[in-house]
């Protein structure tokens, strides 16, 4: 197990750092970022961001049209209500870029940039959060950048909230009053959504690479590399450990009513009832470390593992089906209508779509 933990740590903690200084990065240096708007899947994978048709896996466009050695993409894209695709670079160019998929350059078949923010000092790993007319974007430089999405500026400015929180790798969460931010330096922050003041900050004793989530009980839940699931009062930051996991909780828990689903690096998958404070069933152990977040679907929960497998479980923890995709899976799958899209590493294809029974519908490999 010690060797397994070392391997996972090297891949996940080291890959982004390598990509940040590797100017013509190629695929496979880090886990890709994945998002969807219901019609297209958006994949951040090394030198390019790809837009892929969910119907047949066809490449619709890529950005940039030609490789730019200063740009490297691994952060999951964020889709705004007006259809812009926002993604940050982990390369030597630390830009946060908004792409307009409805305005395509006919010469390169790449979307034009709607705006760009260049004020960050380090690379982007987390997807930004859109709330009302603001964008809350956390950077590996330890700062929160708050951007106005309606200022009509092509070169964006930002309000900088200095958190001194080390590397910020996870998308912020909000309840409409505060924005919650997790950090690799063990800290959870709450920032007032209107004033941008830090309301509270708490040390968890372990790095927090995943996002905080809000439970049905109104409490905030956070998993950490201290191998604990922590419950917070969102208003005060008072917190307590509600579960000791066998090993590191790397990813963001999945929320389904009163239930939280999460995996750990030892390969355990758990279902926790926030109303009782107890596990719903004995943890299931699929086949390898779990660092991707679970995906809660209508009639099952999908769990992806480091072995390159996807497991579908019912809400009682029974395995319904398994699909061996290959490679390694560190990226949380995304739901898109009737299919689930998965982005593995170390495979010939970049994406695979699965139907509700785990059958492969299509795969995506970029055009030359």
What are these regions (language model features)?
Residues 21-30, 35-368:
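Extracytoplasmic/lumenal domain signature
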């Amino acid at each position: 197990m010690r060797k397994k933990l070392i391997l996972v740590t090297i891949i996940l903690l080291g890959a982004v750092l390598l990509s940040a200084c590797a100017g013509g990065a190629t695929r496979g240096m880090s886990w890709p970022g994945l998002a969807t708007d219901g019609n297209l899947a958006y994949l951040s994978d090394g030198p390019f961001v790809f837009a892929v048709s969910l119907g047949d896996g066809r490449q619709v466009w890529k950005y940039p049209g030609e490789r730019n050695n200063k740009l490297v993409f691994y952060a999951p894209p964020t889709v705004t209500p007006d259809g812009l695709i926002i993604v940050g670079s982990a390369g030597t160019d630390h830009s946060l870029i908004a792409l307009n998929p409805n305005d395509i350059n006919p010469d390169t078949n790449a979307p034009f940039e709607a705006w760009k923010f260049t004020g960050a000092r380090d690379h982007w790993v987390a997807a930004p959060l859109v709330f009302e007319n603001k964008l809350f974007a956390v950077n590996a430089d330890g700062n929160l950048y708050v951007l106005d999405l309606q200022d009509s500026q092509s070169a964006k400015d930002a309000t900088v909230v200095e958190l001194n929180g080390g590397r910020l790798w996870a998308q912020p969460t909000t309840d409409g009053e505060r924005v919650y931010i997790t950090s690799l330096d063990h800290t959870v922050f709450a920032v007032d959504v209107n004033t941008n003041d830090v309301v509270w900050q708490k040390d968890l004793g372990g790095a927090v690479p995943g996002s905080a989530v809000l439970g049905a009980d109104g409490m905030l839940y956070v998993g950490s590399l201290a191998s604990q699931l922590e419950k917070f009062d969102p208003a005060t930051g008072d917190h307590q450990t509600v579960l000791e996991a066998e090993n590191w909780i790397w990813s963001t828990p999945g929320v389904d009513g009163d239930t939280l689903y999460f995996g750990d690096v030892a390969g355990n998958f758990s279902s926790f009832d926030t109303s009782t404070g107890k596990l719903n069933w004995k943890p299931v152990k699929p086949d390898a470390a779990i660092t991707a977040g679970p995906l809660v679907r209508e009639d099952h929960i999908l769990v992806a593992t480091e072995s390159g497998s996807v497991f579908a479980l019912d809400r009682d923890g029974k395995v319904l089906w398994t699909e061996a995709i290959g490679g390694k899976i560190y990226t949380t799958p995304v739901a898109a209508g009737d299919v689930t899209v998965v982005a593995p590493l170390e495979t010939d294809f970049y994406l695979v779509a699965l139907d509700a029974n785990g059958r492969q519908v299509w795969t995506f490999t970029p055009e030359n």
